[in-house]
Amino acid sequence: PISSFFVAGASKRGWTTWTTAAVDSRVIGMAPIVIDMLNVTPSMHHHYKAYGEWSIAIEDYENYNIMEWMNSKEYDKLLKHVEPYEFIEKFSSIPKFLINGTIDEFFVTDSWRFYWDDLKGVKHLQYVPNGNHGLRGDYYNMTLKNLISYYYRVINDIKMPILDWKVHKDSVYVRIDPNQKYSISKWTSNNTKERDFRIWKVGDSSWVQSKIEKNNSGSYVFLKEINEGYTAGLIEVEFNGIEDFPLKLTSGTWIYPDTYPFKEYKPEPPLGTPLLSD
C-alpha cells in the first residue's frame, strides 16, 4: 500500500489538491497550481471589484447563477464542506508550494492576500511572470522543472530556502538568508487604464524583469512604482544551492494603487436565504 505521497494539480485539480491534503494523512507535500481562490468569498468579491464583471473564463459558473448564491445561508453551509480554507489548520504540517500565473484568465493576480497570512507551517509561493492559466509554452516547462525541484527537496527532507516577504502600504520588504546562493529580480507590469492584468488585457509579455544587485545582509526594501493607471509587481528569487535543482520562489504580487474601480457585486435578485435574516 502507498504510505505517503506528494499531491499536485492545476486548476480544478488544484482545488482537489487542497481537499486531498485536508483529509488524507499520507500527504507529505502539496502543490496547488493556478487555483488562486482560497477563501473563495472575499476572493470573488475582490474579482468583481477589480473587473466590474465576472471574467469570461468563469462564464459557465455565471450561467448557472452560482454567484447569485453568495452571502446566503445555503452557500455558506456548502462552503463549510467543500472550501479548503475551512480546513486551513489541516495544512500546517504539510510543505505547501502554491504556483499561480500573473496573467491568469480566471483569478486576480493579488488574491494571495485573502489566505497567505493564515497558512501556517512550511509554505512557499511562485507567481509565474507572464504565465496564464495554462502556464503555456516555455512557462509550463519551467514551472514543471521548478515543481520537481520543490518535490525533490520534500522527498529527500532537504531544508527549504528561507525567503520572507511582506507587502505593506507603499513598500515591499524582503529578507533572504545571505548564506544561501541566490539571485534576485523584480518583475513589473503596467496597465494604464484598468486594474486588470489578464492576458487579453496586457498581453503575454507585459511583465518585465529587472535584476537586483545582491547585498550582504539579504534584506531589501522596494517602493511600489507610481505610474499611469495600475502597476503590478513581484519579487522573484532563484536559489541555486542544489546542482540541477534550482528553485524559484516569489513574493505575492502587489498592485498599486491598491484601490478598486468598481463596487462590490450585488445579486439582483439574490438567491437563497440571506445570512442576516432571522
Model region roles, listed by residue range:
Residues 1-11, 26-27:
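Gly/Ser-rich "nucleophile elbow"/oxyanion-hole loop immediately N-terminal to the catalytic nucleophile
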Residues 7-9, 31-33, 99:
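Short beta-strand immediately N-terminal to the catalytic nucleophile in serine-hydrolase-like folds
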Residues 9-19:
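Glycine-rich nucleophile elbow surrounding the catalytic serine of serine-hydrolase chemistry
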Residues 19-68, 126-129, 134-142:
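Hydrolase active-site cap/lid region
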Residues 74-131, 169, 173-184, 191:
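Serine-hydrolase catalytic core
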Residues 149-188, 205-218, 223:
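Surface beta-strand/loop "capping" patches
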Residues 182-189, 195-197, 232-235:
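Beta-strand-rich binding/interaction modules
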Residues 228-242:
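Short, aromatic- and glycine-rich surface loops/edge beta-strands on solvent-exposed regions
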